[in-house]
Regions:
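Bacterial N-terminal signal peptides
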Residues: 2-10
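Composition- and surface-driven signal marking solvent-exposed, interaction-prone regions
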Residues: 1-2, 47
Length: 154
């Protein structure tokens, strides 16, 4: 399975990529910043495909961040409660960390007491996605992909 997330911001926009942090295994986590001529700015990191911030002007033109999140990468590793992340392989709880489908019972990783929550111990919010900037003549975005192997997390 290769989930993909694509965010496009139109109207004379720009996209930039910069290092944002390092995983404990040394993998680099990047952050993409998308801006448009109206001052709107979206920041998306490759760890968890997290929307780190979304700044938009109010009716007086003042920018304000409208999403919950942290200013530094380390807090996402130690304090995150799914802020801005892609939840999955399944969003919500699966009771007793198991389910049956077409006569087969699947055992999942229990990470919420005896339950499976938001994709398990290593859900989509805990992996580094591959990021690619998109620029289609002024319409910009970032394509994020992650391949989840069959049986990963249960």
């Amino acid at each position: 399975m290769a989930p993909a997330l694509v965010l496009l911001v139109a109207m004379a926009a720009t996209v930039t990529r910069a290092p944002f942090g390092k995983m404990p295994d040394g993998a680099t986590v990047d952050i993409y910043t998308l801006t448009n001529i109206h001052g709107m700015e979206a920041r998306i990191m490759t760890y968890g495909a997290v929307v780190v911030s979304l700044k938009t002007p109010d009716r007086s033109g003042r920018l304000d961040d409208v999403v919950l999140g942290f200013d530094n990468f380390e807090d996402y590793l130690t304090r995150s409660r799914f802020f801005g992340a892609v939840a999955g392989r399944y969003a919500n709880r699966i009771g007793n960390a198991r389910f049956s489908l077409d006569g087969t019972t699947y055992e999942l990783a229990a990470n919420n007491g005896k339950n499976h929550l938001h994709g398990g111990r290593r859900g989509f919010d805990k992996v580094v996605w591959k990021g690619e900037p998109i620029d289609r003549g002024g319409d910009v975005g970032v394509a994020l992909t992650y391949v989840s192997a069959d049986g990963e997390e249960g």
